[in-house]
Amino acid sequence: MGSRTGMYKKDRKMNHFLKKIAIAGALTAVATSAANLPTAKEVQSKMGMGFNIGNSMEVPNNPTAWGNPYPTQALLDSVKAAGFSTVRIPCAWDSHAPGGKITETWLDSVKTVVDYAMRAGLYTILNIHHEGEGGWFQSNIGTSVNSNIDTKMKNYWTQIANKFKDYNERLIFAGANEPGPNINSWTSQHVSTLMHYYQTFIDAVRATGGNNATRTLIIQGLNTDIDKSVASAPVSTFPKDKVSGYLMFEVHYYDPYQYTLMTSQQDWGASEPIQPQYYYGDYQKSSEPKRNAGYNAWGGAVDSKLAGIDHPKEQFAKMKTNYVDKGYPVIVGEFGANIRTPELNGSDLNLHKQGRVQWHKDVVTAAKQYGLTPILWDMGNESNSGYDNMAYIRRQSSPVGKVLETDVINAMRGVYGLGNYVNTGVTHVEDFIGGGSTIPTSSSSAVPASSSSTITSSSAIQPESSSSTTALRTVVSATGVQLHREGNTLYGTGKITLFDMNGNLVRTSGSSAGNTELQLQGLKQGLYVAKCGNKSLKFIAK
């Protein structure tokens, strides 16, 4: 019985492999057309509400350095299941670009996450983020163009755009993050400089051709601040695009700041210190008025507009009048509020949580009313109870993908007419990513989950029989598939190189031609990318 069971499992593994080959062929065969993609307005109409994978891919040098594990298919599927139709992937590039050239391994790493999002059926925004505090671009918006910055903008976006040129309209590029955080007063020269860099971004992407000729692109407001943008960046200042109707505009929303982000008392020149605020809307605490959202230390009273939906409505109405109505769809690329778990407990924490539900619902309601796409900021730091956090979907502990604040998510879902949240689980295989091929609609790449998506490098792996190994090699050669993993062995039709997710070379196969093998025993825990020819394969070593 044991032998028959073993052969049955072997046959099932081979059948599963052949199914994946068939899927790969389908993915490669579905070539995207260079015909015009849907316009920005058409794209935005399907974006619903969105979710940020924050504090991850934008971390300089190492996407796991700030405590979040590398994004997985399980996470992206969970984002979709929670009711989000869009995901924003903040991303670092400069720290992965020695000599100005982005490493191919980092491009493959980013592609892996983009492919996860595509398989989950999500509209996907990929940007150049801040690369640390300020970075090479964000805090360097001067009154004249810096040629080094301009060159980087062109080089990076040319490389990024070429990597993704065949992806469909569900992939969107965003030029920056929050440009100019150090500028208190934007002059026309500052605005002109920023718009010049955006022109470089747009021209670089369009020049790569393919679907990038009409891909939706996003430019950011002045520090993504609503009032600064309205005051100093009207559409007349915008860069020019070769095609009409393919640009979006981005702002962020964290109002009132004392409620959403402030973590310590500040002295801003009022007659009393400015304190963090914990209670919002209908859930304010009468015995602590200074802790209520909208409390004005200069006036000694709560500004009722800041304590309810009137403020986001007023702000988002400005976006509609100044940008949406003039042909530029608007996304609220980030919004969110810290949960005050270190400071509050008991009934105070419950009151705070009730107010959080109302705040998130108010923001999403106002955004939808004025035709904006709201995208929730998530830092993924739910496992750290020592400071305020902004984590809505679990990333750092099991089960990955669990919604942490169901009441908040359900309030947001309700605005879009969705029912209460139900976890639908993982529906995709994670370890088969064809290098160089396009990811079409998610239904084309959905296959049942398999235990083969991870390996345990320290565990004993039953050796493949010589006949099954020969059969596998024959299938690999006959189908043109250049890279596959069985157990703790990679098989390829040329030299195999193995990298960690930061682009460091880990090991290579000895041969550079013909059928090759690479053993995986002894790897440290983590995620790896194997490459053979134009094929890439990502896997997890536990």
Where are these regions (language model features)?
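Bacterial N-terminal signal peptides that target proteins for export
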Residues: 12-22
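Hydrophobic h-region of N-terminal signal peptides that target proteins for export
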Residues: 25-34
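Active-site mouth of glycoside hydrolases
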Residues: 38-216, 220-232, 383, 395-416
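Anion (oxyanion) recognition and catalysis
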Residues: 118, 324, 364, 368
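Active-site region of glycoside hydrolase catalytic domains
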Residues: 151-307, 317-337, 369-370
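Aromatic-rich peripheral "rim/lid" segments of glycoside hydrolase catalytic domains that contact
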Residues: 342-439
